[in-house]
């Protein structure tokens, strides 16, 4: 064997040895990374919601993402997708249940096709004030509904308050149930539509973005929604009368795919839970303040505001009792249970 052959052979073995070392090191590194992930290594979660970026709930989700990263020491991060960038409110829930989306903030009204018992929050005059809402959601009602979520492979991290539902119209002051007779009002779902009908008006189905023009053109006389939504959509420009009934409550759910939750380390789960609960408490205070602030803003913008006196609530309850009865009939024992939990919290 000549000297050139020997040199090439030595070079070949040196290169082969180096390549083998790199391969083994790579395998070792991959194994280590996998082990770290299983023990609570860096994980990114995707969080979607349809609300615009300037909405107070959207801002709360940004705070939530930041706190998760802080509390986990960077081992868990949350990437947010606001304003329907990733999923709309209609497609989001299926994505969460299938695992296509890790987390989503969505109205409980959008979950009612999956969990009909969530409609209880729209059953009129069950939860008269913010204290009763908090007591119900943090207590028996919340636990019962969270168990229903888990049956669908979903973990409800927190309930995020959106606010009370009121009535606005451009025809006349609504100071008693009889004043609703003959009006055409837009409702946002099954129970709100039943409530409108029980009060003697005709429910109309349409998207929230269509309401302003519909009132302006006379297609409808008014609508039911929260004052924050009324102010944001400038309903005060087309509707003169606002009736504060607090007859229903809009709640959002920060829901997570249960399998994804189970895949996290205990430390990551703790960071997620702690951040979520902190944000829940802040949202609760902000929502109550926003309700009061936007009600005053609507008044300043020219709307006549009538608040149903506590002494008159009983007659409004009586007028809409059929809605409660139908809800219980449609949902059986579970329906009766969640109604009872609301009534217990309101005492």
What are these regions (language model features)?
Residues 2, 28-132, 141, 149-347:
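N-terminal secretory/targeting leader peptides
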Residues 2-15:
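Bacterial N-terminal signal peptides that target proteins for export
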Residues 18-19:
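Residue-level detector of intrinsically disordered terminal segments
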Residues 22-26:
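C-terminal motif of bacterial Sec signal peptides marking the signal peptidase cleavage site
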Residues 135:
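Short beta-strand-centered segments that line the small-molecule binding cleft or hinge
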């Amino acid at each position: 064997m000549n000297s050139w052959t020997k040199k090439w052979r030595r070079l070949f073995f040196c290169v082969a040895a180096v390549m083998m070392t790199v391969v083994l090191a790579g395998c070792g590194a991959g194994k280590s990374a996998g082990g770290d992930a299983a023990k609570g290594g860096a994980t990114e979660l995707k969080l979607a919601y349809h609300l615009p970026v300037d909405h107070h709930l959207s801002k709360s989700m940004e705070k939530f993402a930041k706190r998760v990263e802080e509390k986990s020491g960077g081992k868990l991060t949350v990437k947010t997708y606001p304003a329907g960038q990733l999923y709309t409110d209609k497609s989001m829930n299926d994505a969460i249940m299938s695992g296509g989306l890790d987390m989503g903030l969505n109205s409980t009204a959008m979950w009612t096709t999956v969990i009909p018992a969530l409609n209880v929050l729209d059953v009129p005059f069950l939860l008269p004030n913010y204290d009763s809402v908090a007591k119900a959601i943090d207590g028996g009602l919340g636990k019962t509904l969270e168990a229903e979520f888990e049956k669908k492979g979903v973990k409800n991290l927190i309930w995020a308050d959106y606010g009370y539902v009121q009535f606005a119209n451009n025809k006349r002051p609504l100071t008693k149930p009889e004043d609703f007779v003959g009006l055409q009002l837009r409702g946002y779902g099954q129970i709100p539509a039943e409530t409108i009908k029980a009060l003697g008006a005709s429910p109309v189905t349409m998207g929230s973005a269509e309401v302003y023009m519909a009132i302006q053109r006379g297609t409808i006389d008014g609508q039911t929604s929260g004052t924050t939504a009324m102010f944001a959509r400038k309903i005060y420009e087309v509707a003169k009368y606002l009736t504060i009934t607090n007859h229903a409550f809009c709640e959002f759910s920060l829901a997570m795919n249960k399998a994804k939750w189970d895949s996290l380390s205990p430390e990551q789960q703790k960071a997620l839970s702690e951040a979520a609960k902190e944000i829940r408490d802040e949202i609760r205070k902000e929502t109550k303040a926003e309700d009061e602030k936007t009600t005053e803003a609507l008044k300043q913008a020219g709307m006549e505001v009538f608040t149903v006196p506590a002494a008159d609530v009983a007659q409004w309850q009586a007028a809409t009792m059929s809605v409660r009865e139908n809800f219980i009939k449609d949902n059986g024992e579970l329906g009766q249970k969640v109604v009872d939990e609301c009534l217990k919290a309101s005492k």
